[in-house]
Amino acid sequence: MMCYDNSEMLSRQIDVMANDKPLMLTSPKQRQGGYFEQLACEFLQEQGLILIAKNWQRPKVGELDLVMLEKGQAWSTLVFIEVRQRNRSHFGDAALSVTAGKQRKIIKVARYFLHQHQKYSDYECRFDVIAYNTSNNKNSENETDIRLDNQLNQPLEKDQPEWLQGAFIASAW
């Protein structure tokens, strides 16, 4: 299942290099981030959310990983989603990596998004986090766990996303 944008195109324009080819995610970290954002988008669409924007940017301010719409019977909620992935370690899990500073940045970019897309300005808003805590342990140096793509640190089947709904709030919204 692919993560499709079901509404008007709100995502940022793709920068074009001199040879008219779009810039590709080239670093391993960028590819890994894109992979987990795609997984999160597909997971949330399976839960009934509708994709509004993916990787929406406000230059010199920040980026929103996913902006989705959750339709309710009484009202709809615009959901700003931060996707995080971290290998399990003693430094804490993926959800803990969304610091107060990162939260402020996401809120600031969300304000710009709402200002630019005023048709959503009356919607209830929520800030969620999708966290992937992956495993990259090997049994030995010579053995490879075939369930794990070492380049992308793909989650094992038992590693499901942790969906933190309303993970943080925007005061004085």
UniProtKB/Swiss-Prot annotation:
Entries under InterPro entries matching the protein: Restrct_endonuc-II-like (IPR011335), tRNA_endonuc-like_dom_sf (IPR011856), UPF0102_YraN-like (IPR003509)
SUPFAM superfamilies given in the database record: Restriction endonuclease-like (SSF52980)
Coiled-coil ranges from the UniProt annotation: none
Molecular function terms, GO-annotated: nucleic acid binding
Any one Pfam family match given in the protein's UniProt record, by short name: UPF0102
Family recorded in the similarity comment: Belongs to the UPF0102 family.
Classification via PANTHER family: UPF0102 PROTEIN YRAN
Protein name per its UniProtKB record: UPF0102 protein Psyc_1908
Source organism of the structure: Psychrobacter arcticus (strain DSM 17307 / VKM B-2377 / 273-4)
UniProt lineage: Bacteria, Pseudomonadati, Pseudomonadota, Gammaproteobacteria, Moraxellales
